[in-house]
Amino acid sequence: MNPSTNDFDYRSILGAERRTSLTFSQFLERFLEAPNQTLKTSATMILEAVKHFGVEAVIRSGEPCLRYHIFQDPFSNGINSVFGQEFCIKRIIDVIESVDKESGPRRGIVLVGPPASGKTNMVDLLARALEEYSQETKQKQYSFFFRLANGHGRELELRSPLMPNPILLFPTTLTRPDGSVSRPRQEILDEVQRRHGHDPDFSIPSYYQHATLDKRSLDILETLRQHPRNEGKTLFEIIEEYVRVEEVEYSSARGKGISNIDDMRQLQVQVRPISLAEDDMRLLNDHLQGKYMFRYEGALLSSNRGLLHIHDAFSGDGDRASEMEYKPLLMLLGSGKTSMEFTQASLDTTVFLTTNLEEMNRLDQQLTSSKLLDRIEKVPVNYLLDAASEMDILKRDITNVRERYQVDPNLVRIAAYYSVMTRLFPPQRSSFPPDWSAEKADLYLSIPPEKKLFIYASRSEDPVQTIAQLPPWHPFRNECARLGIDLRDEDVVNQLVVRHPEATSLEESSLFTNEELAIIDDDFMRELYHERYPKEGRYGLSIRQIQNIMRNTIANSDGNKVTVSIFLSQLEKVLQEGPHVHHWLNLDAPQRSSDRLHPRTIGNVILEEGAGNYGDYAGLIQVVKGIYHETLRQEITVSTVDRDPERIEKDLRKYLQHALLDKALENKAFAHVIVPRYTYIDPETGEKVDKPDYEFLRSLEAILLQDATSGEGRKKLAQKFLDLQSEGEINIEESKPVILSRNDNLLAGFNTEYTKLLSHRKTVEGVSPEELRDAFFLRQNNPEQYEKQSAVVRDQVDVIQRNLGDRFDYPEDIALDTVVYALRKEIIDFASIIA
């Protein structure tokens, strides 16, 4: 491309300049004007960085929680995103908040959990957020360096690896010429308190009241004070002449405010001599006569004012971590200091440690570890229990695969369902809330793995209402209040809440009866989740292991199509190979089976009593097969019947409107009051409708109801609508009848009825079920013979394949294979779909 026509300016992208430095007096002017900007601790900086990138809310198991955007990795296009760990992240934020507010002793935050649960990614994203946030022009943090000059243009800059705050140049005590002792640090802090103490958000962290500089910085200051050329100068004048204040930018790569280590021995501070050129050494000796200079190195120093991440913290040499190795950590978490050159320096570091369950258990059992255990806060980071979030990870992993292969649209879903079910524990509680009925308690205890799976991943039909019904003391309310989010404003809440596109309602899963759906509420879901926390998710199939199985699925494909059936075969192969090949099959997991599982049928898979139990990896393959088969039955049925979803929705709304009119007319005494509530103007004819269309009602009841003659089914559906509306489960647009409302969640409450109408048998002229079945087999196995079939049969095959692609995202070849698979496994029978 001709450079003259190229709009891309490659020079400008590397055009950043070094930030200017300030004199000490210039810094103090800024400090006195806005001390809050300077008096930030590491915890404050991390919290501000997290909040700076934004937040949204999700509902998990009936519980609202905040999802901070930094954990979606906005820095690298989501490559290192952490999905579904909102409860864990809240614990982390709570601990940092307590440190920031100095509401308790300093604690190291230990993220503990099984391998590949996202622990390291969480800390890495916190570090990256801190790094990016510190580069924002409005968020200036300052450090200082000594600048020595010879008057001929040569300068030498001496920096401390601690990036100390310039406020620490004010000594805590100072002897005046008359022998009296003053407290310069306290005096400057008292002055800013006098100026800004009226601001409720202003506070002075105790760190800045008591912290001291490192020995080398103090030695330099003292040597400069004693130098003959500085005789008669005050400490302020010396600082003004020799010190420059500069803006701080955190950097993981350069070890500035952020340190990452994988060996506790790297916590030790190293003291090394400075190697300088001859001219620089002459300059140094000119100002610091007789002073042999050293430099300090170490992870603790480089993480000052920021974040220290210790990977695999308690592995140590041999079987356990040595107390000698983590002694520097004990000092840091105990006194906020580190030892260097036979003295101590104050540090302000937020410490994160990541470790697995085995290493943490070994530390717990060490007799000498109690001092460390008292100074850490454990945060469990387990495998995901939300299948929708598990899908997010798997989708990210196969992004490139989709460019080279045709991928079954159900592959990621079924893989996520299986992996999550292997991690679940059965409900076993012995006592229940006093307002629970016996039926509710019995349902709770008999929940099988597949139902628990869908409860954990269910879509909240009205998240705004879920949040509105939270008690005043709920932690979510407090968390939002700290962020300035007004939960009383419905528009604010609507914008805050996000809905996962892969989440399904319990009704859509086809696993729950109407009676069960009526019992399961937000309270039920919350109790189910919290009973097994934090054990649930520690065991089972890890995301790395499911990724390996997915890779084997791709490797065993035909080089073009990656299907669910291949994935299920790979799962069965893994179980056949056993724990000698796949170590996770032999992990020492606690007993997880339930003795309350009744015989059940999922799709076309029949499970006897106790089959498909918690922790039964082989049985759970049959469970996930049943879910997959039921999914195929619904998808192929809808694609075959080929009805317009919008038309079906309108028919359902019309049915409910007329059923309500019929119910209103039954109440003779109050009909004159109730009927007008359900009267409406027909948008197609413009006529007022105040009487039910009984012929229309009966036509739909022939599809919806087993007994369409007694009228009882119609009454139940009308009452169901009224109950859901009064309980806030469905919300019809204000001042609109149900038939005219559109911006609502009606289908969430009537998904079963909607699906029945959508998949009702269709009459196809000139095509028999047998001909259609044979045509699919011929198209796959004998294309020449297929072309000899009648045009109307081939057209119907095309319609089904096209609908599978348009409605459910099937690639053309996989759509054909899927229908043939469903016919072979007797998942579908065209005789029950078309007439």
Task: Enumerate the language-model features and the residues they cover.
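Long, basic/Gly/Ser/Thr-rich N-terminal segments
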Residues: M1-A43
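Conserved ASCE/P-loop NTPase catalytic core
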Residues: L28-A835
